[in-house]
């Protein structure tokens, strides 16, 4: 026959199963058993034609076929012999095919199984037989119709009851993965339940049975939103509608076209259903005019102020409506940036603090994120809550920090309001520890300034300072204390309680590590810089206390200062020159710092201007532990316990531009690889406009010129110099400065311990000064790489810029950076820095190396023979 390309034997078997011809199917499936039967019939006269007529071409084909036909052969649509037999209700043939091993759950190309075919035509006995052989009772076809739905559509009550007793899901939507094995590509099959199919075709008995088994009367199709009650209204089945309402069907349910079952019955002119549903329905049909009028959300999208006003005036509740995304009209107006609409909605009592149901954003957050500054101002004036958090934990202030180029005024505005709110609520009794500090003593937390209007005034002055700085000459260093301060004339608050340690002797050196995490910078002038840094950190934590932000540092709130196009090192320092117009090599080589004089000893001693020291070229003496010994300061020096005279070296003291000075002893201390040190000394109050000095020297104090006040002998005690090959994360003990008794009987000041959180490493004999510039350069690099989350690791391990440029992949793994991609980014940045600035850094390091070599030789010659090095 060859029809459709199927072998003739296949076609014969499928036709036999469709017709219920068990004998032909047996001959085709068991040719060995059929031949003897035919031979036994030959001797009978006249039987052969009858046999041939009965068997027909099937017998001839069976004799021609030498091998048996596969029991699971199928036609072009994938229908098997078992499916044909089940659809026809031929129970003996179905039983025979199952004994021959036919697959009970095989599907055709449309996802239909043999059980579906039996249920479709209501063959209870065949369905029972298939279920006994393991047929899937919850199978679905490619359209999403289940076996129960197929049976309910046909109104076959017996099959429906059999399927329910066999465990069929009454609403068939419980298993989530049923249609995965059907070969279909539709993500959303028709969501028609058995109850809906029975109602649509008017099978009340099946509806009653399904309702008794717990069918959901309010299950609506996702695509059109139709409920079973709407289908009953469509078909005009009053009895079915009454059953549904008795079981809890909602008559006010709306379809996607916003129609109720009452409107469906009205449209279909089913008067009995209209009369029945009318008193039950509270959602009344809209007039044609109402249907043509756009809702308030559409009016807002069009920007039609007059239409929004009319809608709000007609029904004030519309201003707080919620759309499908959980958003209110005020949120939509805040996104579009239309201030007039925002004002109108707020005047109509729109809830300014309402959060959407999807992300938890408020109108203030939307306006902030989209940069609508005027709307932010207006909402804040209307009392919008800045402390509300979205579902991801962000506040409005946090969102503005995430913008690539946030508006400075917007940042100031939100920050000031956040601080004011926290000030009104009262600051917490204890502050959380900063990420970079593992150990923080209670006395090490600076007090927030309360002068000139409190935090808000302080933030305004700080923001004004941002505006005065030039963009091209500013590194991303946060509030580096070597910049001129516009409010430096303020008296510095005494921080004795926070910055002074108790008097110590030589044996108290073991207590230094506990004090090390107090501040990042040392020197008595660094107290102001530390106070600013901690103040800003505290302010950000109070204003936006979200710890999941990329960083809690101030750098996140300096939007005008964009990072440079490439990694620039020392660019700020190279641009500075001396007053006489001549470039100062020491300024070029070393990051700039500022120092504040602290006269001690004689109470009325005035500090003299401190100027850079010009050193003669002296031969270098071998480096030894003697260089770390005790120094007897020159009798020409005066000015307190830590005053060091340098005039005998031939150095001339000159005043530096901008009030920023480099103290040479800080470089000596840095080369000795002293561990983190903080010079804690009683700060003196002076009105000289000199910025705070975040230095790394234990002796960063000004020296008076020769001929000053009477000399005061002091004893400088330092620990033994560590080997030059110390790692970048050295934890060596900090050197200690212990003043000896004054010859004039003056009470000695409290001993000062030197400890800095910047543990400096030395490369090629040079050193990097422990200024805040190094840290903020490193911070800027991490920010540009979007790796701010690793900043606490570098701060905890005290990796400065010099050490950062020498890190390897193994070092990064030891630091705790486990992600390969992050390590590759950091290594690429290090390579770029070293490649682009290699020559310049080499010159810098050679300059520092020569400077230290010269000064070490000079310093070692100035020691008095009576002093022996410390043990």
Swiss-Prot record:
The gene is ANKS6. Residues 773-836 form the SAM domain. PANTHER family: MASK PROTEIN (PTHR23206), PROTEIN KINASE DOMAIN-CONTAINING PROTEIN (PTHR23206:SF7). It comes from the Eukaryota. It is linked to Nephronophthisis 16: A form of nephronophthisis, a chronic tubulo-interstitial nephritis that progresses to end-stage renal failure. Some patients have cystic kidneys of normal size and no extrarenal manifestations, whereas others have enlarged renal size and severe extrarenal defects, including hypertrophic obstructive cardiomyopathy, aortic stenosis, pulmonary stenosis, patent ductus arteriosus, situs inversus, and periportal liver fibrosis. It comes from Homo sapiens. Hydroxylated at Asn-138, most probably by HIF1AN. This hydroxylation results in decreased NEK8-binding. GO terms for biological process: determination of left/right symmetry; heart development; in utero embryonic development; kidney development. The modification Phosphoserine is found at residues 657, 734, 742. Keywords: ANK repeat, Cell projection, Ciliopathy, Cilium, Cytoplasm, Disease variant, Hydroxylation, Joubert syndrome, Nephronophthisis, Phosphoprotein, Repeat. The record marks 823 as: Essential for ANKS3 interaction. SUPFAM superfamilies: Ankyrin repeat (SSF48403), SAM/Pointed domain (SSF47769). This is Ankyrin repeat and SAM domain-containing protein 6.
């Amino acid at each position: 026959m060859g029809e459709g390309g199927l072998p003739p034997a296949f076609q014969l078997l499928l036709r036999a199963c469709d017709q219920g011809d068990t004998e032909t199917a047996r001959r085709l499936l068991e040719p060995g058993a059929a031949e003897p039967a035919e031979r036994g019939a030959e001797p009978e006269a006249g039987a052969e034609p009858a046999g041939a007529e009965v068997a027909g071409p099937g017998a001839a084909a069976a004799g021609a076929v030498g091998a048996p036909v596969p029991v699971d052969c199928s036609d072009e649509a994938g229908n098997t012999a078992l499916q044909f037999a089940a659809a026809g209700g031929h129970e003996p043939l179905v039983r025979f095919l199952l004994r021959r091993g036919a697959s009970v759950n095989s599907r055709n190309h449309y996802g239909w199984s043999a059980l579906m075919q039996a249920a479709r035509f209501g063959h209870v006995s065949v369905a029972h037989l298939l279920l006994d052989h393991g047929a899937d009772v919850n199978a679905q076809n490619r359209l999403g119709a289940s076996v129960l739905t197929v049976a309910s559509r046909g109104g076959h009550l017996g099959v429906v009851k059999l399927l329910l007793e066999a465990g069929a899901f009454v609403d068939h939507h419980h298993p989530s993965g049923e249609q995965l094995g059907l070969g279909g590509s539709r993500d959303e099959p028709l969501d028609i339940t058995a109850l809906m199919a029975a109602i649509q075709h008017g099978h009340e008995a099946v509806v009653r049975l399904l309702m008794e088994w717990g069918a959901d009367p309010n299950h609506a199709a996702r695509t059109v939103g139709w409920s079973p009650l709407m289908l009953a209204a469509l078909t005009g089945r009053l009895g079915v509608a009454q059953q549904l309402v008795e079981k809890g069907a909602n008559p006010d349910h709306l379809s996607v076209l916003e129609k109720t079952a009452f409107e469906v019955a009205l449209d279909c002119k089913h008067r009995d259903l209209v009369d029945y549903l009318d008193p039950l329905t509270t959602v009344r049909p809209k007039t044609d005019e109402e249907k043509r009028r756009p809702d308030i959300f559409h009016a807002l999208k069009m920007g039609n102020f007059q239409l929004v006003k009319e809608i709000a005036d007609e029904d004030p509740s519309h201003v707080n409506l919620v759309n499908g995304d959980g958003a209110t009209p005020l949120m939509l107006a805040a996104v579009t940036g239309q201030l007039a609409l925002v004002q109108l909605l707020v005047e109509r009592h729109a809830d300014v603090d309402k959060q959407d149901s999807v992300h938890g954003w408020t109108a203030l957050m939307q306006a902030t994120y989209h940069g609508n500054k005027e709307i932010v101002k207006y909402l804040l004036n209307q009392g919008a809550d800045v402390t509300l958090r979205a579902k991801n934990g962000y506040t409005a202030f946090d969102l503005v920090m995430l913008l690539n180029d946030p508006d400075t005024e917007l940042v100031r505005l939100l920050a000031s309001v956040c601080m004011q709110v926290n000030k009104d609520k009262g600051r917490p009794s204890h502050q959380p520890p900063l990420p970079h500090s593992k150990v923080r003593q209670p006395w090490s937390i600076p007090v927030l300034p309360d002068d000139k209007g409190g935090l808000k005034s302080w933030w305004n002055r700080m923001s004004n300072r941002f505006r005065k700085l030039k963009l091209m000459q500013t590194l991303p260093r946060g509030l580096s204390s070597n910049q001129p301060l516009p409010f430096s004339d303020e008296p510095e608050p005494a921080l004795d309680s926070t910055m002074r340690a108790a008097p110590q002797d030589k044996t108290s050196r073991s207590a230094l590590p506990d004090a090390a995490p107090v501040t990042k910078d040392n020197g008595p002038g660094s107290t102001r810089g530390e106070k600013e840094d901690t103040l800003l950190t505290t302010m950000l934590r109070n204003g936006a206390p979200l710890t999941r932000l990329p960083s809690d540092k101030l750098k996140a709130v300096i939007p005008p200062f964009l990072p440079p196009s490439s990694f620039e090192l020392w660019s700020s320092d190279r641009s500075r020159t001396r007053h006489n117009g001549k470039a100062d090599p020491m300024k070029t080589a070393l990051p700039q710092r500022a120092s504040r004089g602290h006269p001690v000893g004689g109470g009325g001693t005035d500090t003299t201007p401190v100027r850079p020291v010009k050193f003669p070229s002296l031969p270098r003496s071998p480096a030894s532990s003697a260089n770390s010994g005790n120094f007897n300061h020159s009798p020409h020096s005066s000015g307190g316990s830590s005053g060091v005279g340098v005039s005998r070296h031939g150095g001339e003291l000159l005043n530096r531009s901008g009030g920023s000075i480099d103290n040479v002893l800080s470089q000596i201390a840095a080369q000795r690889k002293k561990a983190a040190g903080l010079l804690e000394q009683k700060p003196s109050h002076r009105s000289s406009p000199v910025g705070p000095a975040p230095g790394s020297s234990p002796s960063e104090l000004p020296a008076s010129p020769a001929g000053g006040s009477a000399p005061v002998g002091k004893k400088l005690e330092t620990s033994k110099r560590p080997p030059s090959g110390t790692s970048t994360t050295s934890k060596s003990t900090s050197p200690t400065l212990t003043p000896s008794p004054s010859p004039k009987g003056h009470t000695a000041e409290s001993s000062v311990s030197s400890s800095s959180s910047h543990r400096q490493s030395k490369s090629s004999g040079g050193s990097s000064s422990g200024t805040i510039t190094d840290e903020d350069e490193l911070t800027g690099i991490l920010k540009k790489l979007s790796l701010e989350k690793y900043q606490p690791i570098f701060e905890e391990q005290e990796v400065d810029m010099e050490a950062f440029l020498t890190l390897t992949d193994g070092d990064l793994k030891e630091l705790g950076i486990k992600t390969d991609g992050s390590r590759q980014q950091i290594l690429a940045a290090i390579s770029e820095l070293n490649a682009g600035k290699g020559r310049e850094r080499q010159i810098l390091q050679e300059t520092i190396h020569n400077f230290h070599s010269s000064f070490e030789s000079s310093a070692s010659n100035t020691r008095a023979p009576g002093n022996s090095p410390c043990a």
